[in-house]
Design a protein with these regions (language model features):
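A helix-coil-helix interface module used to build multimeric assemblies
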Residues: 1-175
Length: 175
């Protein structure tokens, strides 16, 4: 959710002020996400106890980092962005975008690599068994002669089609 807030704040501030962030400021602001740790998360939880709202706590944490009141603050000229944090965004807007980003990241970093590994193993296996003759079955009854490699390759081809669809999926968010 911090990533959504940072990205949105950079975008809305640029639109409303007519000025983009310098590369240095952009990098500093992005470092809020890159350096976010369990220790930082605990600070957000402490803020949440006082404001009784998880996203308000995250907004306050982000603002404190930009204003320089946080020991690891990127500060500099970034305090001018504090009025734009969460401007016009509700909790569901942020959560919706955050979940879409998490789904996309898990697809790219976990699921697709695992599926590709399985596909690679099946391709090698089908190739190895391409000359292993076997009797195919239809409705449980012996039918044509085929090869074990071909019988592995057919569902593998279907799997590859599904992987292409999965790769091209877009994740929708409320905004």
């Amino acid at each position: 959710r911090l990533s959504v807030i940072v990205s949105y704040t950079k975008s809305i501030a640029s639109e409303l002020t007519g000025k983009s962030l310098s590369r240095a400021d952009d990098s500093k602001f992005s470092s809020l996400v890159d350096t976010f740790s369990f220790t930082e998360a605990r600070k957000v939880v402490q803020l949440e106890k006082s404001v009784n709202h998880d996203l308000k706590a995250l907004e306050l944490y982000c603002a404190s980092r930009l204003k320089g009141s946080h020991p690891a603050s990127p500060a500099g000229g970034l305090s001018r962005l504090t009025p734009f944090i969460n401007l016009g965004l509700g909790s569901e807007d942020i959560n919706s975008m955050a979940f879409a980003m998490l789904l996309k990241k898990s697809r790219e970093e976990v699921l697709l690599p695992a599926i590709r590994e399985i596909v690679d193993l099946l391709v090698k296996f089908a190739s190895k068994e391409k000359e292993t003759i076997m009797v195919a079955r239809t409705h449980g009854q012996p039918a044509n002669v085929t090869t074990f490699g071909k019988e592995i390759a057919v569902p593998l081809s279907r799997l590859c089609d599904e992987v292409e669809l999965f790769q091209s999926m877009t994740f929708q968010a409320k905004c």
